[in-house]
Amino acid sequence: MTIALSFSDTIALLHLGDDENRFSPEFLDQFEAHLDDAISLGAHALVTVATGKFYSNGLDLDWLAAHGDQTGWYVGRVQALLARMLTLPMPTAAAIGGHSFGAAAMLALAHDFRVMRIDRGYFCFPEVDIRIPFTPGMAALIQAKLTPQAAVSAMTTGRRFGGAEAEAIGIVDATAKEDAVIGTALNMLAPLGLKDPGTIGAIKNTMFGQAVAALKAVS
């Protein structure tokens, strides 16, 4: 599994992969390292994207099954990444070209904007059906980004939202055909590229302070 960083002009493109792109410890390490690179290289904005059937399928359940004694550490690691994305000091957009489930859907919500493929892929929180309650931090993140109506619909039903449904309820900001998802995300961010990073970071930390505190408060 290799995550790659490229640029479109001054906008960083973080490529998550072409498989299920689950959140293994290696995946999380690479993601964080590339965020560091994007910042150090002077990116004005960032888009995350994946190739194939999945944007990401979320938590690495196989790794968790084999390392049950490290569950607390792992959840803390995932939530630290969500908190960082939520407050990244640049405009961000998730280009969702495939399925986005569970923690991956939370990662998408941690971006400032979301563009979803119109004709394929589902956005879903399956936790209610797989009997895994949301942590306080994860619930706080979702509720910070969605209206109460959308949060209840997404969190308590296990509903799989297609692109049009996700846009209608406010989960994503736009939809596009397969070959236009990335371009739409880039166009969304391009006018925002000259915003001051320190100011953006400060605003996000204030806006999402409660969610960030809950994400970082892992026992």
Where are the model-predicted features located?
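Amphipathic alpha-helical segments at domain termini/boundaries
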Residues: M1-G17, S153-L194, A202-S219
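Conserved CoA-thioester-binding segment of acyl-CoA-metabolizing enzymes
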Residues: M1-V49
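Catalytic-core regions built around general acid/base machinery
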Residues: H34-D37, R77-P89
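Hydrophobic/aromatic residues within transmembrane alpha-helices
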Residues: T48, L107-A108, A166, A185
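Glycine- (often His-adjacent) and acidic-residue-rich active-site loop
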Residues: V49-L81
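Short, active-site-adjacent cap segments at secondary-structure transitions
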Residues: K53-N57, F101-G102, Q210
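Glycine-rich beta-to-alpha active-site loop
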Residues: L82-I130
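Hydrophobic, secondary-structure "cap" segments at the distal end of domains
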Residues: M138-Q149
